[in-house]
């Protein structure tokens, strides 16, 4: 059975903003998001993104005390899903997901995987586009990304 790939909103927003949303599809194929994530994204979804919601609404509400609705719903769905990977960037959300035993990656992990899978030749042009947005990318993090991507 193929691993389920779940995503929070930030990866979709930032990659769409720089014209690279298709990278997620090329790296992972189909992904799953929740209604809350779809509402935060606010744009028409490509056919390779499907919507599924967590069954346990109370658990989602408890998570909302720590993180926003999109992150809470994505984490709650990940808890209910067996063998999944959650794409999430928010530090608080990442820490919470890891505490719950959820495998995670982030936008930069998607970009690195695209490079390591020979989907893209270099992460540098994508990082340059991201730096032109309001997405935070420190010099230290950029160096780590380049190193992991073998650049």
Where do the language-model regions lie?
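A generic membrane alpha-helix/interface feature
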Residues: 26-28, 89, 107, 119
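Acidic, PIN/NYN-like endoribonuclease modules and their adjacent C-terminal/linker elements
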Residues: 35-37, 43, 94-151
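Active-site-proximal, substrate-binding regions of enzyme catalytic domains
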Residues: 2-84, 91-94, 100-102, 125, ...
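Short, Lys/Arg-enriched, disordered terminal segments
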Residues: 1-3, 150-151
């Amino acid at each position: 059975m193929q691993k389920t790939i779940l995503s929070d909103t930030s990866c979709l927003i930032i990659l769409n903003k720089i014209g690279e949303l298709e990278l997620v599809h090329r790296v992972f194929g189909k992904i799953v998001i929740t209604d809350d994530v779809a509402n935060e994204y606010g744009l028409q979804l490509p056919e390779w993104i499907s919507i599924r919601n967590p069954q346990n609404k109370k658990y989602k509400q408890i998570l909302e005390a720590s993180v926003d609705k999109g992150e809470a719903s994505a984490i709650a769905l990940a808890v209910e899903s067996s063998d999944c990977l959650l794409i999430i960037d928010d530090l608080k959300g990442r820490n919470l997901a890891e505490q719950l035993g959820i495998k995670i990656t982030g936008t930069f992990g998607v970009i690195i995987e695209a490079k390591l899978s020979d989907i893209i030749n270099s992460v540098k042009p994508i990082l340059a586009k991201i730096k032109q947005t309001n997405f935070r990318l420190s010099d230290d993090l950029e160096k780590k990304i380049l190193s992991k991507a073998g650049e």
